[in-house]
């Protein structure tokens, strides 16, 4: 257990925040039978989905704004401390294998850096300047997008990052789990996931964390759909970087162009592992270079590329 630092000053009283309030359903939490404990958590975990649904309009606005910037060469950054920051890092890390995106395209910036993935970063989240400095260190610029994640909406590290994004003309998106009037944040788009008081008072890794993960899943996936990395419901830009993903790539080829595994493997070898390229090559009878040129003309969008060539894939 970390020792107490007697010089550390408390923050302003945060008891008014929705995420810090006591949940009346859990006031006897330590007295409940195990089955009742589990059932209570299950019941409360319905709320994150409702909170995300209530924020759908703001999330959609963020998707469109981010997609526009990324299409013009911008990048997406998640910034946060503790659970919020770790969730951003997790979502960013999943983009390259799922969508074959450049690791620079979606980045997670966590207060305290990589060590804070495993251990808390005491003190760093309390500094607005640290948020600015970390973004600057990552080369954050005007054409980029920032999602600043802070469950309680008061984290100085995140506030500093959002202020910096606003000051340079980057897209600033706030994501918090308290009402705007309790913790206003500098931003262009404000996403509020109002999950209510936690069963364990103040432990925002619970409902707030769940809602945040859901919102980030939706945000990154729908942005990638807009960028043309999906055809139907298939991840046609999947990076075949392990045995499981090679198998998934082969099944996508089988389902969309009817090739069996041996021919699928040969197509992947010809297309340098690109499922999207392999699909267009086979469906339109093109060489790799020809297919690549068509995709480039259509901003890597498979559907219009197929239409240009008069080719079709199987109906899903």
From Swiss-Prot:
Catalysed conversion reaction: N-acetyl-D-muramate 6-phosphate + H2O = N-acetyl-D-glucosamine 6-phosphate + (R)-lactate
Which Gene Ontology BP terms does the record give? amino sugar catabolic process; N-acetylmuramic acid catabolic process; peptidoglycan turnover
Q: What is its EC number?
A: 4.2.1.126
Q: Which residues does the annotated region (Disordered) include?
A: 1-23
The gene it comes from is murQ
- Catalytic residues at 94, 125
Provide the species name. Synechococcus sp. (strain CC9902)
Other notes on this protein? Answer: A lyase-type mechanism (elimination/hydration) is suggested for the cleavage of the lactyl ether bond of MurNAc 6-phosphate, with the formation of an alpha,beta-unsaturated aldehyde intermediate with (E)-stereochemistry, followed by the syn addition of water to give product.
Name the source's superkingdom: Bacteria
Tell me where in this chain the SIS domain is found.
66-229
Pathway(s)? Amino-sugar metabolism; N-acetylmuramate degradation
Q: Please name the GO terms that the record assigns under molecular function.
A: carbohydrate derivative binding; carbon-oxygen lyase activity; ether hydrolase activity
* Name of this chain's protein: N-acetylmuramic acid 6-phosphate etherase
Q: How does it assemble?
A: Homodimer.
Instruction: Give UniProt keywords alphabetically.
Output: Carbohydrate metabolism, Lyase
User: What family does the Swiss-Prot or TrEMBL record give for this protein?
Assistant: Belongs to the GCKR-like family. MurNAc-6-P etherase subfamily.
Instruction: Tell me the function of this protein.
Output: Specifically catalyzes the cleavage of the D-lactyl ether substituent of MurNAc 6-phosphate, producing GlcNAc 6-phosphate and D-lactate.
Q: Name the Pfam families on file.
A: GKRP_SIS_N
Q: Which InterPro entries does the entry mention?
A: Etherase_MurQ, Glucokinase_regulatory_CS, MURQ/GCKR, SIS_dom, SIS_dom_sf
The protein's enzyme class = lyase
- Asked if the keyword Lyase belongs to this entry, the reply reads yes
